[in-house]
Amino acid sequence: KIKHVPSIAMKRLIPMGLPKKELEPFIEGFCPDVIHLASPIFLGHYVARLARRANIPTVSVYQTDIAGFARHYGLTVAHNTLKRWVARIHSTTDLTLAPSAWACRDLENSGVQNVKLWQRGVDLVNFTPEKRDAELRAEFLQKRGAKYVIVYVGRLANEKRVDDLAILDSQPDLQLVIVGQGPAEARLRRELPNAIFVGYKSGADLARHVASFDTFVHTGKHETFCQAIQESLACGTVVVGPDTGGPTDLIDHGRTGLLIDTADSHLLLHSVYNLLEHPALDLMQLAARKSVEHRTWDYINESLIEHYRDVIESVASRKNLVA
């Protein structure tokens, strides 16, 4: 069943669901064994407190650094408030799952206890080097007579810092391809005049784009994980990414890509060329694929079910102690 709730869009941030009184009898009537809270804020906190009173186990998932987004936009007061609020929410739940070691540390440093790592899976059948399309690559190279194709995949929003790619867009031998859509697209089209914007892609079409190009570059500094990087690695496409956040769990520096300060334009340019012209690039591409081959969705989901079981047993033990 799906229950719709109202939401609020805070300035420049993603919409957030709001509590609704009708949820309490709905949850009590449904009587779940465990409640999974994805990126809980207002609605999630409300449900977590309901669950606590009803002795229903809760698992919260930390997957969006909303406080970091606020800081990026210069909303210092909002950043500090959201940081404390997020910690308070996750401290209300029985277990918090975070997608990267960085995200786990971030929560623990904020005072959240009982945090465990739960990464993301990747579709290894769809995202594979076999999806490389030489004709697609040649089509993009023809626009400017470039030598290499660089791809960015992700939401086109200010916090993703896609404009940091301007130094790459200015190089005549590099063709930048932007895959995605978002509120910053119009501005980015002006700031990256040589880039090719192909819009939102998914499924096999997305895999074909990621697998066909020479290097994937990601510039967002508030990623708790970054699924786009993982999908790129699965395609055997090496990555240049930020040396902070979730990407540090995914990119093996010097082996499957490079971790750098992507805001340093000269370092970014040097790093991209370093990868493109690396004598062992073919070995790095093989290593990229190998690095994620164990992360099937079956394996990841099985680990989630184990977390559910652990929490259910833990709360049951707590009930027995109280009784």
Residue ranges and their predicted role:
Residues 238-241:
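Short hydrophobic beta-strand element within catalytic cores of glycosyltransferases
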Residues 139-173, 177:
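Conserved donor-binding/catalytic core segment of Leloir-type glycosyltransferases
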Residues 280-294:
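A short, well-ordered alpha-helix in the C-terminal region of glycosyltransferases
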